[in-house]
């Protein structure tokens, strides 16, 4: 079965860009990989224009992905948003991400929310081992999640989310079948108002543990793959300059909670090494929950590292992002951001730019990615989001009466 294109796409999605090993043989290229990597793609244009930050930014309709606990602090009674991203357009032309999110407030202290994510990898020509055409496959992935958030005190809220994940490789082979998995998120958010001479500023602190899930399999559970469990921690500070102008400064750190797969070259004897076989067996039999904790210390089991080098490798797995958002009269928005990943863990480094316009009930946002790595496939990525606010719709109806 020829699935070369599918493998190339999956390889790119986890950020695998070629890096020369001659620079430092100890600091070898060792990215953390997982199944269904589309779950880690930033879905909306607002956060996408601020360097992919969102754990502690001011609540919006697309908070479901970044931190659903923020919904308990949102002011409008309900809202819905639709986002679209043409993905990896520098590589292929038919990969797309669509994202639908919405929420509804129950009183002043709690909210329910949901999102639907659909990721299409386009069409792939399938052949058998002899190159005979076997039709066309259309790999796709989607997830559906619902969340409940509640304010537990004046300035603190929490949320839990449940998620169903589907991943179909589009392979016409009786040995392969679509993968299914279930996951959960746990999120916390604190929004603390601080009075200034120019108005009330807002300090936000957020934490989201996402995709705490079962493993996924495409071959009737003979092989099981971790999904990208993730920890995102962020801080945000929104400063009003006067009644019309405001600037928010945002910073996130992000760590995927999956251990790195053992590499045979780090073991004496390579693939024939008993130690390598034992390390592979440990990885493959590990539960998803155990893997979350092990992901903070897996480098210490790498025989190629000293303890200091193992510690540095763990630090390299922490990505960071920062972003700014300027708003005028809560109607016009300008955004800028930067996201950084170690060159040994994927080398995804990029600037982002964004703009938004809000008119009573509607808001349109656009985000753009400018890649910095020479061969990054993320360069020139565009995101679009269109949001509808229920309170704004009510205001429009009232004006028409």
Task: Name what the model sees in each region.
Residues 1-25, 235:
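Bacterial Sec-dependent N-terminal signal peptides
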Residues 23-401:
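Subset of outer-membrane beta-barrel
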């Amino acid at each position: 079965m020829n699935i070369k294109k599918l493998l190339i796409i999956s390889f790119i999605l986890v950020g695998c860009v070629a890096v020369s090993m001659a620079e430092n043989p100890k600091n070898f290229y060792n990215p953390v990989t997982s199944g269904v990597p589309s779950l880690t793609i930033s879905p909306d244009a607002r956060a996408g224009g601020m360097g992919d930050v969102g754990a502690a930014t001011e609540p919006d309709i697309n908070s479901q992905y970044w931190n659903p606990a923020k919904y308990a602090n949102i002011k409008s009674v309900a809202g819905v948003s639709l986002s679209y991203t043409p993905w990896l357009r520098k590589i292929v032309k038919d990969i797309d991400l669509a994202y639908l999110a919405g929420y509804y407030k129950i009183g002043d202290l709690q909210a329910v929310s949901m999102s639907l994510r659909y990721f299409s990898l386009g069409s792939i020509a399938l052949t058998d081992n002899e190159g005979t055409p076997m039709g066309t496959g259309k790999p796709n992935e989607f997830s559906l999640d619902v969340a409940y958030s509640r304010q537990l005190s004046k300035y603190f809220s929490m949320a839990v989310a449940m998620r169903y994940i589907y991943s179909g490789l589009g392979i016409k082979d009786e040995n392969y079948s679509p993968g299914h998995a279930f996951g959960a998120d746990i999120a916390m958010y604190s929004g603390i108002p601080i009075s200034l001479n120019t108005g009330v500023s807002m300090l936000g602190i957020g934490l989201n543990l996402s995709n705490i899930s079962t493993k996924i399999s495409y071959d009737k559970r003979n092989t099981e793959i971790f999904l990208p469990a993730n920890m995102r921690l962020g801080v945000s500070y929104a400063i009003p300059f006067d009644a019309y102008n405001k600037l928010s400064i945002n910073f996130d750190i992000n760590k995927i909670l999956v251990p790195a797969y053992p590499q045979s070259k780090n073991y004496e004897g390579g693939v024939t090494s008993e130690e390598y076989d034992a390390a592979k067996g440990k990885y493959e039999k590990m539960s998803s929950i155990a893997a979350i904790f092990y992901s903070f210390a897996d480098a210490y089991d790498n025989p190629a590292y000293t303890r200091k080098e193992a510690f540095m490798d763990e630090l390299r797995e922490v990505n960071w992002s920062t972003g700014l958002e300027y708003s005028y009269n809560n109607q016009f928005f300008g955004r800028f951001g930067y996201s950084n990943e170690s060159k040994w863990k994927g080398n995804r480094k990029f600037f982002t730019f964004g703009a938004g316009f809000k008119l009573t009930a509607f808001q349109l946002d656009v985000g753009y990615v400018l890649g910095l790595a020479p061969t990054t496939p993320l360069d020139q990525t565009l995101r679009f989001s269109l949001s509808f606010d229920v309170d704004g719709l009510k205001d429009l109806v009232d004006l028409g009466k």
